[in-house]
């Protein structure tokens, strides 16, 4: 069977589209400064290691998380913006994943966390090692990559709420958030919203799709693209 020759980014996009990574997902990724075609080119097509497959999966998990959260608020009738700058005395402090004005005229900022767990760092891990204890000993080892997510979340919520805006933390079905983090968010007047999308199923499906795309490129495609000078996460 003659292999398909891909000579530009549009050729990669066409194949990604065929595997369900369509324009809305690519646009969401672009807002997050993630070039998905280049990501696949760098990590999957050129160097398909287990680490790179995991890297692409995690990047796409964040993209899909923002996509589903954006869709959720649009369905509520809100005029949603993504990656909105939050300023302090004219200086860029951070960016909100999602921003909208609610029915009371209040500015809302949203921080989306597509994670298995959001846990106080001290309780979560022992001696900063890869070994989990307590509640988490039976969870997948990949969860260790989220060990600092709770600490980062609290810092981000503090930044987002600095101007008095309402802050929503968006998590997904299956995500475990411990009571320490919940209390800290409550103290910051942040709301926790859980979307009815299971985080485990979402990541598993994304990874399966990444592997299918890898298999397709390996068997059916010859790549001849020069991405020289371009960078990706």
Regions found by a protein language model. Give the residues of each.
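Acidic, metal-coordinating catalytic cores used for nucleic-acid/nucleotide bond scission
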Residues: 87-90, 94, 173-179
């Amino acid at each position: 069977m003659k292999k398909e020759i891909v000579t530009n980014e549009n050729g990669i996009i066409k194949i990604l589209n065929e595997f369900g990574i369509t324009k809305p997902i690519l646009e969401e990724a672009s807002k997050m400064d993630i070039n998905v075609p280049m990501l696949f080119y760098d990590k999957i097509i050129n160097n398909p290691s287990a680490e790179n497959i995991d890297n692409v999966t995690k990047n796409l998990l964040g993209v899909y998380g923002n996509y589903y959260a954006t869709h959720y608020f649009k369905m509520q009738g809100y005029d949603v913006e993504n990656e909105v700058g939050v300023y302090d005395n004219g200086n860029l402090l951070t960016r909100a994943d999602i921003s909208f004005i609610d029915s009371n005229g209040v500015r809302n900022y949203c921080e989306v966390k597509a994670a298995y767990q959001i846990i106080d760092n001290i309780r979560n891990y022992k001696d900063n090692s890869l070994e989990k204890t307590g509640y988490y000993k039976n969870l997948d080892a990949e969860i260790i990559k989220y060990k600092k997510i709770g600490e980062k979340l609290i810092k981000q919520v503090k930044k987002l709420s600095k101007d008095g805006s309402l802050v929503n933390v968006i998590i997904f079905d299956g995500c475990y958030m411990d009571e320490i983090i919940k209390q800290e968010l409550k103290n910051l007047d942040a709301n926790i919203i859980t979307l009815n999308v299971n985080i485990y199923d979402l990541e598993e499906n994304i990874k399966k799709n990444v592997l299918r795309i890898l298999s397709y490129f390996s068997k059916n495609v010859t790549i001849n693209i020069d991405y020289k000078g371009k960078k990706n996460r």
